[in-house]
Amino acid sequence: MHKYRTHTCGELNLAHVGLQVKLSGWLYRRRDHGGLLFIDLRDHYGIIQLVFNDDCSIIQAEISKIKFETVITVEGTVIARSNETINKNISTGDVEVVVSSYVVESFAEELPLQINGEYEAPEETRLKYRFLDLRGARLHQNIVLRSKVIQELRNQMLSNGFIEFQTPILTASSPEGARDFLVPSRLHPGKFYALPQAPQQFKQLIMMSGFDKYFQIAPCFRDEDARADRSPGEFYQLDIEMAFVTQEDVFGLVEPVLYNTFKKFSNYSITDIPFPRITYDESMLRYGSDKPDLRNPIQISDVTDIFQCSEFTTLKDSINCGAVVRAIPAPMSANRPRSFFDKMIEYAKHLGASGLAYIQFTNDGVKGSIAKFFDEALLARIKKLVKCQDGDAIFFICDKEDDATKVAAKIRAKVGEELNIIKTDCYKFCWVIDFPFYQLDSEVNKITFSHNPFSMPQGGIEAFNKAKTVEDLLSIKAFQYDIVCNGVELSSGAIRNHKPDLMYKAFAIAGYSKDEVDKQFGAMIRAFSYGAPPHGGIAPGIDRILMLLTNSVNIREVIAFPMNQQAEDLLMGAPSAVTEKQLQELQLKLISKERIK
């Protein structure tokens, strides 16, 4: 018989009745029924109930004093449970093991957190004792699922003819949107490596190298603040790049990969292929976001022109000063009590809006705070444009375009929540396309890249040459696209700019000199000068895919050893101080913030 186990704790069933077995695992739960002591033994594979009967009174006395999570090995006989004691909640619930002997492999101290799920410990405790937290069923299953999802993604890429690469972790710093993590060089004092924010340049260089289809389960490192869906420091993505492809070719690859993955690991309904394509401008108008949650059926409309024809003088004055009016329908809520509308108004004020107007299209006529300012013809125009019917209400927000867009998005989400019309058992995918190539940094009044600076501008270099004003430049679109699911951006991608003259021009408009471009992107520019294929790619975030599949509200629930909100690893004590000797080897010296000032 094996030293530790003949079977796992999750595999025993009625076919094993009468068998002598040896099992090892953690002491999970204990129940004393007076003469009979029941222990739930847990390992990676499941839970089995152990029985210590009164024939083993000495063993009972010993085992009853052992702390939870102590690791034990037991020998015993598998028996069938009586009908009234069968446990349908576990895979081994038809049987139990009558123990004849046991050995303690490792004693456990008093636990700082409970494993059996009776209450959840504070996050600081969970992260400090992550090895204990990972024993809990939900988190344990999430990490197992993570492995399966990565395997599924890898298998699909290989079946599509892709080659898996590993690109360098120590590389050069480049301006890709977030701060770099820097690594000082011992051999080259005063110089630093950077951990890659993404393998962006390397995967494009792989296309320059004559490879046709690249993928990588890629670690990415960004020194940025944490969010619920963003881990500080490190995250993983399915990095993809292909040569001689159009935007639609990329979509044609990614859609089945995501569809098949979500179909395999969830029973939710999934958007049929092809996924909807929504332009950036339409997304910002209809949903107030470039990450639309299509589970919410409400769409926002612009009704500025109609309001300008109304008798609503206050709003007309605002419109003449540059404001816009957005309409947010509230289906079948016209007859809701006044408290509903007051609640929405207070919510809008909480968001920073000066107020929130509304109209109710009831069966008895039109009501609401601003209905009196519109004649029947204008009301009919509003109703048609917003696609409302009798029984619906409409909320209106008036503000500068950026502010109106943000508030309307929040109101849309709140109305959907209040009316309980947001579906929860589906995955709604879409592509957001035609992003602006540039944006205006209002703080410094400077044109900057809105997304990836390596994207191909629609219209090529002619689009730059035709642009005579800032507005013309801001109207240029990129072959840039995002894949969004349930309001979560899973990935950005693009058809790349593979022409040196076009790249220099694009960077020059954003304020970069040729020397700066050569210094920061010299390797790629050189590669472009020796025959570069048209190419494009994308990189779906694996952590966010897992969040959706597990219904997790925080990305830390799908990562084995995450950092906290302050980018600290409480388990390992990182970041940590280093010795003076280590600093000397790197020719570095620490100085206080006061001295920097």
UniProtKB/Swiss-Prot annotation:
Residues 200-203 are annotated as: Aspartate. It is found in: Cytoplasm. Pfam families: GAD, tRNA-synt_2, tRNA_anti-codon. One of its GO terms (biological process) is aspartyl-tRNA aminoacylation. ATP binds at residues 222-224, 489, 541-544. Coiled coil: none annotated. GO terms for molecular function: aspartate-tRNA ligase activity; aspartate-tRNA(Asn) ligase activity; ATP binding; nucleic acid binding. Keywords: Aminoacyl-tRNA synthetase, ATP-binding, Cytoplasm, Ligase, Nucleotide-binding, Protein biosynthesis. Its EC number is 6.1.1.23. The keyword Cytoplasm applies. It comes from the Bacteria. InterPro entries: Aa-tRNA-synt_II, aa-tRNA-synth_II, aa-tRNA-synth_II/BPL/LPL, Asp-tRNA-ligase_1, Asp-tRNA-ligase_1_N, Asp/Asn-tRNA-synth_IIb, AspRS_core, GAD-like_sf. The record marks 33 as: Important for tRNA non-discrimination. L-aspartate binds at residues 176, 222, 451, 496. Homodimer. Belongs to the class-II aminoacyl-tRNA synthetase family. Type 1 subfamily. Aspartyl-tRNA synthetase with relaxed tRNA specificity since it is able to aspartylate not only its cognate tRNA(Asp) but also tRNA(Asn). Reaction proceeds in two steps: L-aspartate is first activated by ATP to form Asp-AMP and then transferred to the acceptor end of tRNA(Asp/Asn). This is Aspartate--tRNA(Asp/Asn) ligase. It comes from Orientia tsutsugamushi (strain Ikeda) (Rickettsia tsutsugamushi). The gene is aspS.
